[in-house]
Amino acid sequence: MTRLTLALDVMGGDFGPSVTVPAALQALNSNSQLTLLLVGNPDAITPLLAKADFEQRSRLQIIPAQSVIASDARPSQAIRASRGSSMRMALELVKEGRAQACVSAGNTGALMGLAKLLLKPLEGIERPALVTVLPHQQKGKTVVLDLGANVDCDSTMLVQFAIMGSVLAEEVVEIPNPRVALLNIGEEEVKGLDSIRDASAVLKTIPSINYIGYLEANELLTGKTDVLVCDGFTGNVTLKTMEGVVRMFLSLLKSQGEGKKRSWWLLLLKRWLQKSLTRRFSHLNPDQYNGACLLGLRGTVIKSHGAANQRAFAVAIEQAVQAVQRQVPQRIAARLESVYPAGFELLDGGKSGTLR
C-alpha cells in the first residue's frame, strides 16, 4: 500500500474537533500508510492530541485556519466569504497536490460550490453528485446518488449520475456489470417527471450501462438494483428517512421489554434475541456507511454527516482512502470518454438536458 495524505476540515460538523480529531487518531491507528493534515484552529486541535503517541504525531500536521463556514450559511454567501476558512483551505490542499483527498462534515452547499470552483468538474460532467454505498437485505451493497448536492436535476444530469454510479459500483464495490435504475413513483414507463422519463430513454441507448428501468423507494434495501439514481432533493429525503427508521429499529431491539418483570428464562430468551437480531441487522447501522463522495470532480472530496460521531467520521476518512486507492475520478473520466459517442451525442453537449 502506498502512502496517502488526506486533508481534514476538522472544524466542520455539529461537534467540530471534539469528534473529528479523535476520529483522525482512530484512522491513523487503522492505517500505517496514512498522513493527515488537520485544518482548523490550532488552539482547539492541540489539546485533543494529548493522547497521540510519537508515531501518530509524525503523521499529523496542523494547518491553521482563520474561520469556519457556518452550517446554516447560504452557499453563495459562504463561498464569497470562504477565504481562510477550514473548508476552503482543506480543498486548496487537494488542488495544490499536497493532499490526495478532502474530508469535511461542514455545510453541504458550500462544500459543493467550493469543490466545483477549486477542483473543477470532469470533462462531460455538468455538476458533481453526492453518492454513498448502502447495505441491503441480501448482504450486498447499492450505490445511491444524488444525495443532496443538486436539488433540481434535468435529464442530462441524471444520465451523467448513472454513468458515474455505474463506474463506482464496478470499480470500488466490485460489482460486475452493475444494474442501474432510476428512482421513481412507479415502475410503469408513463410514471414520473419528464426529466426522469427523458433520462430513461437515453440510458436505454447506452450499451455500457446495464439499465433495468424504474425502482420505487420501498425497494431501496431489497438489492434489486446495484445503482439507484435520483435528484438530490429526493435522494436526501429518502436517505434520511431510511436512516431514521433504521436507528429507531435498532434502538427498539436494545430497549424492548426494559423495566418489565419477566421470569428468568424469558429474560434470557429476550437477551439472546436482542443480541441475535442486533447482530443480524447491525450492517444497516448508518454509522457504518457514513461518508458521501462528491463524484464528478477532478479530485476526491468526501462529505460526512454533520451529526457524525467519532466512529462515523472515521468511516468517512476510510471512504476517502478507498476512493483515492481505486482512482475513482480517473476511472470515471475514462468511462465518459467511451460513453460519449454512444449515448451523449443524444444530448445537447451535456448542458441543456434536452433531447435532440
Swiss-Prot record:
Gene3D superfamilies: Isopropylmalate Dehydrogenase
MF terms in GO: phosphate:acyl-[acyl carrier protein] acyltransferase activity
Catalytic activity: a fatty acyl-[ACP] + phosphate = an acyl phosphate + holo-[ACP]
A Pfam family assignment: FA_synthesis
Biochemical pathway: Lipid metabolism; phospholipid metabolism
Keyword presence, Amino-acid biosynthesis: no
GO cellular component: cytoplasm
UniProt entry tagged with the keyword NAD: no
Known EC number: 2.3.1.274
Subcellular location: Cytoplasm
Class of the enzyme per the UniProt entry, highest EC level: transferase
Principal cellular location given in the protein's record: cytoplasm
GO biological process per UniProt: fatty acid biosynthetic process; phospholipid biosynthetic process
Stated role: Catalyzes the reversible formation of acyl-phosphate (acyl-PO(4)) from acyl-[acyl-carrier-protein] (acyl-ACP). This enzyme utilizes acyl-ACP as fatty acyl donor, but not acyl-CoA.
Family membership noted in the UniProt record: Belongs to the PlsX family.
Annotated PANTHER family: FATTY ACID/PHOSPHOLIPID SYNTHESIS PROTEIN PLSX, PHOSPHATE ACYLTRANSFERASE
Name assigned to this protein: Phosphate acyltransferase
Gene, per the UniProt record: plsX
